[in-house]
């Protein structure tokens, strides 16, 4: 009766709810892992794996260091390029040699220089005498600016006269020439003094700057019979005077064969020009 009054006073007791023991209790109370425990641990392991698979794309964590990749791997483009360009340095190393070989004078050019070099130096070098055609050219230019026909031209006309001959003096060169003429020549020059001034400029021409006229003059020095071809006999005859020393038979034939491009045993004017213009 007292118990019923107590229940009525406090209300009916709620039905007891089944409670799950905590994981620690299950782990300590059972000697073996039950199915619920295994499922819970399995889900934790899967979570960890999913988190590790997300990597830096979902979090700001740094990517773990990786081992060295293969040279052809696409993940390392710089190494891929190096791997692809590996043989290129050897090829580029050969390029300068091929280029220098192309521009290096060959034996034919050396033979032509030995054969024609002394001749060109004697005819067109700095120590040579001016030829009749060059003197005529200087005379024509001088007379053009000798307007009063007294045999002199003034220093003011020297620059224009030099340009008529094909030279383009700088302002400093004109000042030096004008001062020299004014101080030592009374402000004007005659033809002989004009030749002394212009002669060195004409003598500075080299073999690769020669025109067709000069090349034909040089060719005629060797072509004694004027048949348009230089033979071994003509070379032997011209060698002492033009080359400064006689040449023996084997040396003459060897030089002629190196310069003879078409193999006919002689050197024509075209072969002569090609040998002198080759660098």
From Swiss-Prot:
Main subcellular location: cytoplasm
Q: Gene3D superfamilies given for it?
A: EF-hand
User: Which residues lie in Basic and acidic residues bias regions?
Assistant: 1-12
Q: Where in the cell is it found?
A: Cytoplasm; Presynapse
> Where in this protein does the record say Phosphoserine is found?
42
What is the tissue specificity?
Expressed in the retina.
| UniProt PTM | Phosphorylated. Phosphorylation levels change with the light conditions and regulate the activity.
Species lineage: Eukaryota, Metazoa, Chordata, Craniata, Vertebrata
Task: Give the originating organism.
Answer: Bos taurus
Q: Where are the transmembrane segments?
A: none
The signal peptide stretch is none
Q: Give binding positions for Ca(2+) 2.
A: 223, 225, 227, 229, 234
Residues reported in the UniProt entry to bind Ca(2+) 3: 260, 262, 264, 266, 271
UniProt feature, compositional bias: Polar residues: 55-65
**Which superkingdom?**
Eukaryota
Supply the InterPro entries for this chain. Answer: CaBP1/2/4/5, EF-hand-dom_pair, EF_Hand_1_Ca_BS, EF_hand_dom
Instruction: Report keywords, A-Z.
Output: Calcium, Cell projection, Cytoplasm, Metal-binding, Phosphoprotein, Repeat, Synapse
**GO BP annotation list:** photoreceptor cell morphogenesis; phototransduction; retinal bipolar neuron differentiation; retinal cone cell development; visual perception
Q: Which PROSITE patterns match?
A: EF_HAND_1 (PS00018), EF_HAND_2 (PS50222)
**Sorted alphabetically, which PANTHER family does this protein's record hold?**
CALCIUM-BINDING PROTEIN 1-RELATED, CALCIUM-BINDING PROTEIN 4
Assembly: Interacts with CACNA1F and CACNA1D (via IQ domain) in a calcium independent manner. Interacts (via N-terminus) with UNC119.
Per its record, how is this protein called by name?
Calcium-binding protein 4
């Amino acid at each position: 009766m007292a118990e019923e009054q107590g229940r009525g006073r406090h209300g009916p007791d709620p039905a007891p709810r089944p409670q799950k023991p905590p994981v620690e209790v299950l782990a300590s109370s059972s000697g073996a892992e039950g199915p619920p425990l295994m499922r819970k641990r399995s889900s934790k392991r899967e979570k960890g794996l999913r988190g590790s698979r997300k990597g830096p794309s979902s979090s700001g964590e740094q990517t773990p260091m990786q081992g060295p990749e293969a040279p052809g791997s696409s993940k390392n483009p710089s190494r891929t390029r190096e791997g692809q360009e590996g043989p290129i340095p050897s090829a580029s190393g050969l390029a300068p040699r091929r280029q220098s070989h192309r521009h290096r004078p060959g034996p034919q050019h050396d033979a032509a220089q030995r054969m024609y070099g002394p001749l060109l130096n004697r005819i067109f070098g700095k120590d040579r005498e001016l030829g009749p055609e060059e003197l005529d050219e200087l005379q024509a230019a001088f007379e053009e600016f000798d307007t009063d026909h007294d045999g002199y031209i003034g220093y003011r006309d020297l620059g224009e006269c030099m340009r008529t001959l094909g030279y383009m003096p700088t302002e400093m060169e004109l000042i030096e020439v004008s001062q020299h003429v004014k101080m030592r020549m009374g402000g004007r020059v005659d033809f002989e003094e004009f030749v002394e001034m212009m002669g060195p400029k004409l003598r500075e021409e080299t073999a690769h700057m020669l025109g067709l006229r000069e090349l034909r003059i040089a060719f005629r020095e060797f072509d004694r019979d004027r048949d348009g071809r230089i033979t071994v006999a003509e070379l032997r005859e011209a060698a002492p005077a033009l080359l400064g020393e006689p040449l023996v038979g084997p040396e003459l034939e060897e030089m002629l064969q190196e310069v003879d491009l078409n193999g006919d045993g002689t050197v024509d004017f075209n072969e002569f020009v090609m040998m002198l213009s080759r660098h």
